[in-house]
Amino acid sequence: MQKNYLELIKKVRERSNPDLVQMTKMYSETLSGSKLFENKSIEYSDVSIYIKESMKGVAPSYTMNSKVAANKVEAHLKKSHGNLVDFERQGSVMTNTHILKENDVDLVQITNKSSEFDHKGLEKALNNTSVLKTEEILNLKKHKENFSPYQGNQIDDLKYVRLKSELVLSSTYKTVDIEKENSIYVKVTEPERDIDVVTATYYKSVDFMKTNDKSRKGIQIYNKKTGKINDVDYPFLSIERINVKDIISNRRLKNMIRFLKNIKYDCPHIENKGSIRSFHINAICYNIDVKKYEDLHYLDLVSILYQELTNIISNKSYRDNIKSVDGCEYIFEFDCAKKLIEIEFLSQELDSIIADLHNQSLLVG
């Protein structure tokens, strides 16, 4: 049975462009037309409009206000912490792959009193300099020479930053949740946005020490419940890679990420959180060979995604080798069965949309 696309269009517009701002065209709809659907009138069908609206980014003015809200929270914390904390951003807002209901913007406060350090990786790299450039060798040696053990207690520092931030934010904003393990939730009222404040320490990876490229710096988030730091993440590298690959793909990568997020959100069989998160959708889309879709019309991107999900479901070897955008973990290593159930639901949604496109093409042909 065909979906109620008018209702779906209404919902996706409400969550991505609540202020009804005039939106610009996507790169993938400025070409002459779809290779699969040569009749241009198909683009005015309800199913095509739903696809287009689901691929578009959130209105720029709305996204800008999300950043303004994060800046306001940062200003309060900066006044309290001074120069002892650096501030960064992570999340899908920084790549413009967010949808309104998953308006993912994290304010990361990072202690600069200490950092984690990949000592073993550094020594291993310096013992095999034949594969390194001269500049990389010099950078590694400099990091080794400049290293000195931290005399304080890193966990105590992070605990103090977290506690002080809880006090500052609770006295500034009406709605604050300090019970979350990895972050402090803050509801900013003007502009009205939800902000998560994460407390972390830097992690100096070998790639960072070789290049001094800030995007190669990792972070380890302080967990309030365990009183420990979590495994290393590379959010800044993920942001850079998605932004760069989107340019290489002629702006199509982000179209696919947003589309799959919206399809997941509209799927009645998948919970809002679920096993497949933004993290996994980013990785799935990022993994697709750019050459397969870099010049395609937006309607053809649906088939590309369907083929990818089908391959993930049927080919274990292929599935097991899909890594996160930062390249640090295999996304189907854990909870694979649950994730595959949701991938199957997403695949069915795409199959249904493709069938409706073909049926509509016959009607207007």
Swiss-Prot record:
A GO BP annotation: defense response to virus
Catalytic class of the enzyme: transferase
Its biological purpose: Cyclic nucleotide synthase (second messenger synthase) of a CBASS antivirus system. CBASS (cyclic oligonucleotide-based antiphage signaling system) provides immunity against bacteriophage. The CD-NTase protein synthesizes cyclic nucleotides in response to infection; these serve as specific second messenger signals. The signals activate a diverse range of effectors, leading to bacterial cell death and thus abortive phage infection. A type I-D(GG) CBASS system.
Reactions that this protein is recorded to catalyse: 2 GTP = 3',3'-c-di-GMP + 2 diphosphate
Other known facts: Bacteria with this enzyme do not have other c-di-GMP synthase enzymes (no GGDEF or EAL-domain containing proteins), suggesting this second messenger has been co-opted for CBASS signaling via STING activation.
Taxonomic source organism: Flavobacteriaceae sp. genome_bin_11
EC number: 2.7.7.65
GO terms assigned for molecular function: diguanylate cyclase activity; GTP binding
Name the UniProt record assigns to this protein: c-di-GMP synthase
UniProt key word DNA repair: no
Alphabetical keyword list: Antiviral defense, GTP-binding, Nucleotide-binding, Nucleotidyltransferase, Transferase
Membership in a protein family: Belongs to the CD-NTase family. E subfamily.
